[in-house]
UniProtKB/Swiss-Prot annotation:
Reaction(s) this enzyme catalyzes, per UniProt: 1D-myo-inositol 3,4,5,6-tetrakisphosphate + ATP = 1D-myo-inositol 1,3,4,5,6-pentakisphosphate + ADP + H(+); 1D-myo-inositol 1,3,4-trisphosphate + ATP = 1D-myo-inositol 1,3,4,5-tetrakisphosphate + ADP + H(+); 1D-myo-inositol 1,3,4-trisphosphate + ATP = 1D-myo-inositol 1,3,4,6-tetrakisphosphate + ADP + H(+); 1D-myo-inositol 3,4,6-trisphosphate + ATP = 1D-myo-inositol 1,3,4,6-tetrakisphosphate + ADP + H(+)
SUPFAM superfamilies on file: Glutathione synthetase ATP-binding domain-like
Protein name per UniProt: Inositol-tetrakisphosphate 1-kinase
Residues involved in Mg(2+) 1 binding: D281, D295
Cofactor: Mg(2+)
Lineage: Eukaryota, Metazoa, Chordata, Craniata, Vertebrata
Record-listed N6-acetyllysine modification sites: K340, K383, K410
Role noted for this protein: Kinase that can phosphorylate various inositol polyphosphate such as Ins(3,4,5,6)P4 or Ins(1,3,4)P3. Phosphorylates Ins(3,4,5,6)P4 at position 1 to form Ins(1,3,4,5,6)P5. This reaction is thought to have regulatory importance, since Ins(3,4,5,6)P4 is an inhibitor of plasma membrane Ca(2+)-activated Cl(-) channels, while Ins(1,3,4,5,6)P5 is not. Also phosphorylates Ins(1,3,4)P3 on O-5 and O-6 to form Ins(1,3,4,6)P4, an essential molecule in the hexakisphosphate (InsP6) pathway.
Positions with a binding annotation for ATP: 106, 157, 188-199, 214, 232, 236
Tissue spec. comment: Expressed in brain > heart > skeletal muscle = kidney = pancreas = liver = placenta > lung. In brain, it is expressed in cerebellum, cerebral cortex, medulla, spinal cord, occipital lobe, frontal lobe, temporal lobe and putamen.
GO molecular function: ATP binding; catalytic activity; hydrolase activity; inositol-1,3,4,5-tetrakisphosphate 6-kinase activity; inositol-1,3,4-trisphosphate 5-kinase activity; inositol-1,3,4-trisphosphate 6-kinase activity; inositol-3,4,5,6-tetrakisphosphate 1-kinase activity; inositol-3,4,6-trisphosphate 1-kinase activity
Origin species: Homo sapiens
Length: 414
């Protein structure tokens, strides 16, 4: 790996807080020891002057959100960043901006999980029913909740999945509690899970599962309890001690998540969006033992992932090797877009713990049609088959193309 990486240039843009939290300077030093040059990008200057760049690592979530609020400075920064990417298709970007926009929107990311559920066939995974509330609760709110499969209690979250406010949530137990909900927000069925959350930190083909405290069990159905407002970040800290996480007793099923399920879930998300650095929050339904994805995060904190820098360096090597192989075979720069979107070339270097791609997974899927099909109802509206989320051998390019077209592109236009 040292010989291959020598002379490569990696640019990064992270907030100062993120740099300190990750101790990212240690990663820069690790890269330099491999003969790579690491450049901290200044987006207030033309990126062209700071290149050439083989790889860009970024967390532009704050900037993207501010740009979406029409902040002129942030709009200029995002435009400058996108302009450089468009002019340099050979540069690997971790991760694509349209995908980040999708993950910043809980409604869109939950819809993506639901689409993956419709594509895969496995009873080990369930997608909690959800819906978006765009206006204050009125007479038809309960009807809409029932139509979308929501029952009390349910959890209410901000639509935006980033920033301090994104951790502010509420558990609603009855119709009266709906009056305190401030739209726009996303409501999601609460699933009892014996107060254990599994945070899956993904770096390309590698992932690490970290166990965290979570909300205790609550009785199913409507009750006269007052709504509970809480900060999920505080509840699920490693050292968290809260009355909300104190479990009276373990009820029903209590087991760890399946490695096979996590592998297939992370692979599906990587190939649907072209992302490499993300987190998946998973709970285990204590009645069925099924895995439920309750959140997806872009470039999380990786707390508890001791090999994060090694995994990241290995992933960069994997992607660059795949790009080099594609170029040698075709000589076509346009295909670099495809290699970056997949970001899972066969035979690459992977992290020490778990590889979530089988040998040749991407090459073997080229040219296949996705088994996932959309049904149409009488009115011509596409309707998803009612299937559990599962673990097929791989996700085909046509499924990837479908998800990117219907979600990421839509997100980038907003």
């Amino acid at each position: 790996m040292q010989t291959f990486l020598k002379g490569k240039r990696v640019g990064y843009w992270l907030s100062e807080k993120k740099i300190k939290k990750l101790n990212f300077q240690a990663f820069a030093e690790l890269c330099r020891k491999r003969g790579m040059e690491v450049v901290q990008l200044n987006l207030s200057r033309p990126i062209e002057e700071q290149g050439p760049l083989d790889v860009i690592i970024h967390k532009l979530t704050d900037v993207i959100l501010e740009a979406d609020q029409n902040d002129s400075q942030s709009l200029e920064l995002v435009h400058r960043f996108q302009e450089y990417i468009d002019a340099h298709p050979e540069t690997i970007v971790l991760d694509p901006l349209p995908a980040i926009r999708t993950l910043l929107d809980r409604s869109k990311s939950y819809e993506l999980i639901r689409k993956i559920e419709a594509y895969m066939e496995d009873d080990r995974i369930c997608s909690p029913p959800f819906m978006e509330l765009t206006s204050l609760c009125g007479d038809d709110t309960m009807r809409l909740l029932e139509k979308n499969g929501l029952t009390f209690p349910f959890i209410c979250k901000t639509r935006v999945a980033h920033g301090t406010n994104s951790h502010e949530m509420a558990i609603v137990f009855n119709q009266e509690g709906l009056n305190a909900i401030q739209p726009p927000c996303v409501v999601q069925n609460f699933i009892n899970h014996n107060a254990v959350l599994y945070k899956v930190f993904v770096v390309g083909e590698s992932y690490t599962v970290v166990q965290r405290p979570s909300l205790k069990n609550f009785s199913a159905g409507t009750s006269d309890r007052e709504s509970i407002f809480f900060n999920s970040h505080n509840v699920s800290k490693p050292e968290s001690s809260s009355v909300l996480t104190e479990l009276d007793k373990i009820e029903g099923v209590f087991e760890r998540p399946s490695d096979e399920v996590i592998r297939e879930l992370s692979r599906a998300l990587r190939q649907a969006l072209g992302v490499s650095l993300f987190g998946i929050d998973i709970i285990i339904n204590n009645q069925t033992g099924q895995h439920a994805v309750i959140d997806i995060n872009a470039f999380p904190g990786y707390e508890g992932v001791s090999e994060f820098f090694t995994d990241l360096l290995n992933h960069i090597a994997t992607v660059l090797q795949g790009q080099s192989t594609a170029m040698a075979a075709t000589g076509d720069v346009a295909l670099l877009r495809h290699s970056k979107l997949l970001a899972e070339p066969a035979g690459g270097l992977v992290g020490e713990r778990t590889c979530s791609a089988s040998p040749g997974c991407c090459g073997s899927m080229m040219g296949q049609d996705a088994p996932w099909k959309a049904e149409a109802d009488a009115g011509g509206t596409a309707k998803l088959p009612h299937q559990r989320l599962g673990c097929n051998a791989g996700v085909s390019p046509s499924f990837q193309q479908h998800c990117v077209a219907s979600l990421a592109t839509k997100a980038s236009s907003q």
